[in-house]
Amino acid sequence: MPIKLYNTLSKEIEVFKPIKRGEAKIYSCGPTVYNYAHIGNLRAFLCADLLQRTLKVVDGYKVTWVMNITDIDDKTIKNVNDESAWKTEMGSKSNDIITNLKQFTSYYKDEFQNDIRLLGFRMDHFHAFPRATEYIDEMKKLIILIAENGFAYEAGGSVYFNVEKWKDADKYGKLKNLDFDNFRTGERVDSDEYEREQVSDFVLWK
């Protein structure tokens, strides 16, 4: 039986056609491990699990599922430096921020995996859980490439993606059907104070 999915790019329901016959690959966004996962996080993970199970059971696809772990960002760095957020189970805190960050995020990564097991996830269904910190060099190279192509700028010691330039190339916001008229310069859309040129720009490197 053919599987039909909603294509957010074409805005139509289409028959799923794999790139390679009999195989499907899924890359889904996992947790940011600065705290325990909540019900809102888990809903997204359950949707990805439902998709991969459906592909396997209904059409017998060989599924390769990768879920990333974001183990470095503003929240993880803030919490690892907060004494009240450090738990005994994480081990002794050292003077090295990198060591502390790894201990802190590893604890919440393990807690996340324990939680999804309780929800019925099978760990052998996952191909890998790559951590963001394992790909820092690759991130740097990509950011440099983006900047060299004129789609990034530096401000306040950070590097930002220039959404306006990419939007003009008619490439940004297609999947989400963004309404750029609702982005207003100077409006706060989150709790972070950034020195970006436009409110729609997002940070690539801090």
Task: Give the predicted meaning of each segment.
Residues 1-206:
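NTP-dependent nucleotidyl-transfer catalytic core
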